[in-house]
Amino acid sequence: MRSIWTETAQIPRRNPLTGNKRTEVVVIGGGMAGILTAFYLQRHGIHVVVLEANRIGSGQTGYTTAKITSQHNLIYSKLEKTVGKEAARLYGKANQLAVEEYGKLIKRYSIQCHYEQKDAYLYSVQESEKLLKEAESAKRLGLPASFVRETKLPFQVHGAVRFTGQAQFNPLEFLRDISAGLTVYERTRVVKVQGHEVVTDKGVIKADKVVFASHYPFVNVPGFYFAKMYQEKSYVLELEPVEALDGMYLGVDKKAYSFRNYGDRLLLGYGSHRTGKAPAENPFSTMKQVAEHLFPQAEERGRWTAQDCITLDGIPYIGTYSFFRPDWYVATGFGKWGMSSSMAAAKILSMQITGKRTPYDAVFSPQRHHLKASALKFAGHGLESVKGLAGGTMPGAINCPHLGCRMVWNRYDKRWECPCHGSGFEINGKICAGPAQQSIPFID
């Protein structure tokens, strides 16, 4: 399954690792977070190596809708209640600075990536009260937010939260240029990490520090990320021709859609659900019906799925991997907001690795304890994991090599999925999504 980004951006191939090497920092993962972290570390004068199991940007970065925004759904009104006003303010500031940093980099290095400044909108066709609260919270926290009654969508809304000065781009075109001066080894899968040794299927690299930017951290102990994070799947339909929308849009109703343009194409998003729990309806069929109604002149040009890591309190894990591994670092749990979160993570981690502190360290710390924000999701995540593990003991079950949960078949995405932690496998058992690191035996 290919996306508009993988179809339109050509990133030069890099050679795999050969033999054993020594470096200051190893970054595991060649997506947006990993490449940006390596980029900033190199600017600090650090010798850094990036290891990518497939190709640069071939993971979730290649299947995003690529909105660069600090508007993360109805998050600020929630964070003010669960983690407090100051932590919510710092979360918003880190992401808004990330939005602005993309613009600075693209201008400074003359990166051709179809970058466009756009306002971002949260909309509802049912009510306006929760949008008013979100706009008030975001504005109170210093973000460029306001409540509006009208949008440029081809249907009437009850209201919307508008964030000005946000942006969109082609993420793989951006990665192509920003990674040009980095040492990246593609088609080099990390098998395990032991202290300061990163063992791959091509050789071993010894490093002073290790960064896990591989979407979902695959080392279970220490860290225990499998117990405090799960994955969600969503669906994207590419349509053409569609007149360019003025803005980027995300619905907040139970059955809502996202919209953004790319030239005369439109990316229509829909259908978020926990990976391994297939929806009752076919998301692509639903989107096709909506597209035929709203954009009758348009034809389908492509379709794909995205998969995102969700933390229990809604804030990414960025910082030291564990108290027991102070030289390991992690960037994960970006939710649906990988572009701004990747930049925020890169800035934070590059400072921490070079021995400096930032005002955002405590907010994003993987060792934080936001009990009020996490309790309900922890219970729900635990229940789903227990069910998956119990299913793995049944006769004839196809088990995930990560922790043994029973695999389920996603008939819409045509692949095997783990309902516990979100690993994915092609029909023949070949691994295509972590945290599992091995394929499963061939399935008839």
Please report, for each region that a protein language model flagged, where it lies by residue.
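Extreme N-terminal leader/targeting segments of oxidoreductases
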Residues: 1-25
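Flavin (FAD/FMN) cofactor-binding and adjacent substrate-gating region
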Residues: 2-8, 74-81, 103-174
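N-terminal Rossmann-like FAD-binding beta1-loop-alpha1 element of flavoenzymes
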Residues: 23-50
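Glycine-rich FAD pyrophosphate-binding loop
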Residues: 43-63
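Helical element adjacent to the flavin cofactor pocket in flavoenzyme catalytic cores
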Residues: 137, 160-209, 213
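Rieske [2Fe-2S] iron-sulfur-binding domain
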Residues: 237, 393-444
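Flavin-binding catalytic cores
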Residues: 242-245, 273-307
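C-terminal catalytic lobe of FAD-dependent flavoproteins
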Residues: 253-254, 284-285, 295-378, 396
